[in-house]
Curated annotation (Swiss-Prot):
InterPro entries according to UniProt: RuBisCO_ssu, RuBisCO_ssu_dom, RuBisCO_ssu_sf
One Gene Ontology term of the molecular function aspect: ribulose-bisphosphate carboxylase activity
Name of the protein described by the UniProt record: Ribulose bisphosphate carboxylase small subunit
Disulfide linkage: none
Self-association state and partner proteins as the record states: Heterohexadecamer of 8 large and 8 small subunits. Forms complexes of many stoichiometries with Raf1 and RbcL.
Record's miscellaneous remark: RuBisCO folding and assembly commences when the nascent large subunit folds with the help of chaperonin GroEL-GroES. Both RbcX and Raf1 help folded RbcL release from the chaperonin and dimerize; dimeric Raf1 binds to RbcL(2) leading to an RbcL8-Raf1(8) complex. RbcS displaces Raf1, resulting in holoenzyme formation. The basic functional RuBisCO is composed of a large chain homodimer in a 'head-to-tail' conformation. In form I RuBisCO this homodimer is arranged in a barrel-like tetramer with the small subunits forming a tetrameric 'cap' on each end of the 'barrel'.
Task performed by this protein: RuBisCO catalyzes two reactions: the carboxylation of D-ribulose 1,5-bisphosphate, the primary event in carbon dioxide fixation, as well as the oxidative fragmentation of the pentose substrate in the photorespiration process. Both reactions occur simultaneously and in competition at the same active site. Although the small subunit is not catalytic it is essential for maximal activity.
Induction annotation: Part of the rbcL-rbcS operon, transcribed in light and constitutively during growth on fructose.
Organism listed in the record: Nostoc sp. (strain PCC 7120 / SAG 25.82 / UTEX 2576)
A biological process term (GO) from this entry: reductive pentose-phosphate cycle
Record keywords, A-Z: Bacterial microcompartment, Calvin cycle, Carbon dioxide fixation, Carboxysome, Photorespiration, Photosynthesis
Localization in the cell: Carboxysome
GO CC terms, sorted: carboxysome
Amino acid sequence: MQTLPKERRYETLSYLPPLTDVQIEKQVQYILSQGYIPAVEFNEVSEPTELYWTLWKLPLFGAKTSREVLAEVQSCRSQYPGHYIRVVGFDNIKQCQILSFIVHKPSRY
């Protein structure tokens, strides 16, 4: 059984090895298939007390494929390599965030 080095945990998916781009695409495909609006956010720290993350551009209202969202994730990664980056699924009917997961952690962690 493979165990990961002891590190800080942020969410359910953080107990798994880092997600590959293919795995991120599958998660984003789920967001799109449920009719949620994907968005990309970033922040310098990932503390439970940090309620507000900076939005990368606008939410991707017109995104039809997971490739479009993944391209934005990769752009954000290249612009902010020392920040945490997460993908968010927003339900515009309930007006709330339904899910989010971290897709990039700074190299210091």
